Regions:
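Exported/periplasmic cell-wall-interacting domains
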Residues: 21-31, 74, 90-170
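Positively charged n-region of N-terminal signal peptides that target proteins for export
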Residues: 1-4
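Intrinsically disordered, low-complexity
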Residues: 20-72, 79, 165-170
Length: 170
């Protein structure tokens, strides 16, 4: 019995280390505040607390093409660490998705959370008039959420929130 107890006590640090959140490895990039991790492969956006524990997970749509964004029009979502540098009320904004339907009103849902992606001023996290696209690769490069989810996310974040977009698998 003493041997079993000793073994359990010896393994306790290893077991507790394995129980850490999968997001703790990003804490050094998060600046001690809640942050966002976007998994393009899993079609998820996770809001994470300053200790690395998930607060809330949302379904997303990301760019049609795989890999990191390199040039305008490549239909790829950027990869890396960014910050939200603008919280734009997007009601009434239009966009032509070049699908033959012409300009779509409220194309970005209620909010557009602009990211500071070098060389690209028009990449962000936003809502959608196409909720059926969530869980698919359907965007020109942005991260798309259901409108109710972008409203919820916007209420939980602030200007300067760190956004980590994980790379596509190679």
């Amino acid at each position: 019995m003493k041997k079993v107890l000793f073994l359990l006590l010896a393994l306790l640090p290893a077991l507790s280390a394995g129980a850490q959140s999968r997001f703790t490895k990003y804490l050094d990039q998060a600046e001690g505040a809640p942050f966002i991790v976007i998994d393009k492969q899993g079609f998820t956006l996770t809001l994470v607390d300053p200790q690395g524990e998930p607060i809330k997970e949302y379904g997303i749509s990301c760019a049609i093409n795989y890999g990191p964004k390199k040039v305008r029009g490549d239909h790829k979502t950027p990869e890396g660490t960014f910050k939200i540098n603008e919280l734009l009320n997007a009601k009434g904004l239009t966009h032509d998705f070049k699908d033959g339907k012409g300009p779509i009103k409220d194309a970005y849902g209620p909010w557009f959370l602009r990211l500071d992606v070098p060389g690209f001023w028009d990449i962000g996290i936003h809502g959608t008039p196409f909720p059926e696209s969530i869980g698919t690769r359907a965007t020109e490069g942005c991260i798309r959420l259901r409108n109710e989810d972008i409203l919820d996310l916007k209420s939980r974040i602030k200007l300067g929130t760190v956004v980590i977009i994980l790379p596509d698998p190679v």
